[in-house]
Curated annotation (Swiss-Prot):
This is Homeobox protein Hox-C8. Belongs to the Antp homeobox family. Residues 221-242 have a biased composition (Acidic residues). GO terms for biological process: anterior/posterior pattern specification; negative regulation of transcription by RNA polymerase II; neuron differentiation; regulation of transcription by RNA polymerase II; skeletal system morphogenesis. Its main location: nucleus. GO terms for molecular function: DNA-binding transcription factor activity, RNA polymerase II-specific; RNA polymerase II transcription regulatory region sequence-specific DNA binding. The gene is HOXC8. It comes from Gallus gallus (Chicken). Residues 149-208 bind DNA. Residues 124-136 have a biased composition (Polar residues). One of its GO terms (cellular component) is nucleoplasm. Keywords: Developmental protein, DNA-binding, Homeobox, Nucleus, Transcription, Transcription regulation. Residues 206-220 have a biased composition (Basic and acidic residues). The lineage of its organism: Eukaryota, Metazoa, Chordata, Craniata, Vertebrata. Sequence-specific transcription factor which is part of a developmental regulatory system that provides cells with specific positional identities on the anterior-posterior axis. Transmembrane segments: none annotated.
Length: 242
């Protein structure tokens, strides 16, 4: 029984030829990939691959047309992959670090005042920071207050206390208008007068009956006197009828 299957590669490759593809692989050249492992010793030197830069240009400009026309007969790996990685794709024409250094030097040369002004500004800024950090320029409101620290108590003169006592006995609760008048007359603030009256009322409640303030007692006395007078008048009317 005969088979009509024919391998299509037989017509392209002759007997004894390798069937490996001829396209290039940029990892290693063909000679290196097929060779055995190299052993480096103290007496041996590492192989160097040198390739002129004009081959790279030939690969980009003429290699593409030759590869497409010749059917991959020319191996471009021998042209492109044997050179140094830094010189591949024309990297040797871009001096990056030297270009940056030259640009920085030219800017300093063209504008010499900028460097001196920047140095002076930095020194002045450090001086201001040192001055601000000094404790001698700390304002009172910037200093942290100790826990439990209280402000000093207001001391009243004898004349002020006497006038405030008189006002308290007359009326323990001051209106806003009367409070302003008393504060102006005694040379005190409205808040100081208010606090003094609050403390005086608390003291009065502790010393006497809690529900009876001086003004309240006076009102009760007037009410009791009025009730007694009414009772007397009623008794006199009843006696006159009899």
């Amino acid at each position: 029984m005969s088979s009509y299957f024919v391998n299509p590669l037989f017509s392209k490759y002759k007997g004894g030829e390798s069937l490996e593809p001829t396209y290039y692989d940029c990892r290693f050249p063909q000679s290196v990939s097929r060779s055995h492992a190299l052993v480096y010793g103290p007496g041996t030197t590492a192989p160097t691959f040198q390739h002129p830069s004009h081959h790279v240009q030939e690969f980009f400009h003429h290699g593409t047309s030759s590869i497409s026309n010749s059917g991959y007969q020319q191996n471009p790996c021998a042209l492109a992959c044997h050179g140094d990685a830094s010189k591949f794709y024309g990297y040797e024409a871009l001096p990056r670090q030297s270009l940056y250094g030259a640009q920085q030097e030219t800017t300093v040369v063209q504008y010499p005042d900028c460097k001196s002004s920047s140095n002076s500004n930095s020194s002045e800024g450090q001086g201001h920071l040192n001055q601000n950090s000094s404790p001698s320029l700390m304002f009172p409101w910037m200093r942290p207050h100790a826990p439990g620290r209280r402000s000093g108590r207001q001391t009243y003169s004898r004349y002020q206390t006497l006038e405030l006592e008189k006002e308290f006995l007359f009326n323990p609760y001051l209106t806003r208008k009367r409070r302003i008048e008393v504060s102006h007359a005694l040379g005190l603030t409205e808040r100081q007068v208010k606090i003094w009256f609050q403390n005086r009322r608390m003291k009065w409640k502790k010393e006497n009956n809690k529900d009876k303030l001086p003004g309240a007692r006076d009102e009760e006395k007037t009410e009791e006197e009025g009730n007694e007078e009414e009772e007397k008048e009623e008794e006199e009317k009843e006696e006159s009828k009899d």
